[in-house]
């Protein structure tokens, strides 16, 4: 006769379902297969993934980036919207390495949860695969960690890792930026993946519901719109205009005010004009509902601009035309000026 202290235990008894993990892998494989590109020698299923750097690079420099989705995940849990946060995950890393001129080559993800829901995880990974397709990189591997007791049921965390390559002579570092250069902005799709702690606080104050109407769309669709991936459009502009594109800034945490200075040398400032772009309705509503000051908006949110380019003044119109031909909404935000005493490196007038 056995009792509860002598009965054989299994991993499932401890909260880890190996069969569910295997079922997820089976769901993931065809999703990853859609992202395959030249260079992949071995992908999902092995102990390590293999990728051959394309031979078109004479002096390739590898560029890597890692990021998560932040507290936007809290809304994904609360509003049961899991199919787009994977796109966010890819976008945050590939847009980051793009600013140095890198072509994203491959991507890996880390999915951690307390109890694995195959359907939820497959929805997330489906978004990751879609993001990789948009970025032209291969989903080459990843890790799913089921850790009982570490996360509440229905919740998970994500991390992503992107690796790209750029020709050594084509690295974009902002060192050639000078007074008179023009600042261009590419439209965002919404709040992207930053500022969501404040977004959630404002939603709570406003008593907002995911299904309420917001200018003809459910609020959930507007708030959870996935981060735009700028890779193919910007790479096309770089291929055509080369060194005339002097600097790129991905507008993430810190908004316009903290991210544009990251590509500027000492002694330079970016002067942006508030009438240079239209702030989307979402940000107008967030500012009104939260009584958020203008400066706070610019240092928390992208305010409608997801990527900034600093370009040679005599090429600004041509570069804008190339980007518009790629489907981008381009705004002329301002220009680079000498930094005066007490002047911020980025300011809006």
Swiss-Prot record:
It comes from the Bacteria. CDD domains: PurM (cd02196). Gene3D superfamilies: PurM-like C-terminal domain (3.90.650.10), PurM-like, N-terminal domain (3.30.1330.10). The keyword Repressor does not apply. Its main location: cytoplasm. One of its GO terms (cellular component) is cytosol. Its EC number is 6.3.3.1. It holds the Pfam family AIRS_C. This is Phosphoribosylformylglycinamidine cyclo-ligase. The gene is purM.
